[in-house]
């Protein structure tokens, strides 16, 4: 990360993740693994009436995977499933280096991971939580990617 402000955001989410805990009462749960890096998370969501009311994750991994999952949950809690999938699509496009400035603003703190697009070895780390969330909310997305 070139920008120290972005680095600080990532470090804060890695060292003090607000959403890294069990979530009793979650009605959706899925494990995501990145075998190339050893990242292993389980994502928990509580969804009611199509809105993500709460979310959490557990597991271990590198700073990027842990921070990304925490930032993602900050962003998606309180959103409708459709909005969440839109944000995920923006995040994945950002990681590939193809988002506009206004789209980047929609990602809030998750936009701090923009420089990952220049670090191919870290891309899978950054997208693990997002892919896990997509699989949980809309399994058809993952089937289409395979």
Describe the residue ranges of each PLM region.
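Active-site phosphate/pyrophosphate-handling residues
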Residues: 41, 70, 124
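Ubiquitous "structural anchor" signal
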Residues: 46, 67-69, 134-137
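Secondary-structure capping and boundary motifs in well-ordered enzyme cores
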Residues: 37, 64, 121-122
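Alpha-helical support elements that line or immediately flank enzyme active sites
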Residues: 68-78
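C-terminal binding/interaction regions
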Residues: 1-20, 24, 79-146
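Structured beta-strand/loop patches that form or line metal/cofactor-binding pockets in enzymes
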Residues: 16-54, 59
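Alpha-helical macromolecular-interaction surfaces
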Residues: 66-67, 86
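Short, thiol/selenol-centered motifs that function as redox-active sites or metal-ligating centers
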Residues: 60-66
């Amino acid at each position: 990360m070139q920008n120290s402000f972005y680095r600080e955001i990532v470090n804060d989410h890695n060292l003090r993740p607000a959403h890294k805990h069990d979530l009793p009462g979650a009605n959706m749960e899925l494990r995501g693994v990145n075998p190339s890096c050893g990242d292993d998370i389980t994502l928990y969501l509580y969804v009611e009436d199509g809105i993500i009311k709460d979310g959490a994750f557990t597991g271990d991994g590198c700073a990027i995977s842990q921070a990304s999952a925490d930032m993602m949950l900050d962003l998606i809690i309180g959103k409708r499933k459709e909005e969440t999938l839109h944000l995920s699509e923006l995040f994945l496009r950002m990681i590939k280096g193809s988002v506009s400035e206004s789209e980047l603003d929609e990602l809030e703190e998750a936009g701090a991971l923009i420089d990952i697009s220049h670090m191919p070895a870290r891309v899978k780390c950054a997208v693990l939580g997002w892919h896990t969330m997509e699989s949980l909310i809309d399994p058809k997305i993952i089937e289409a990617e395979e």
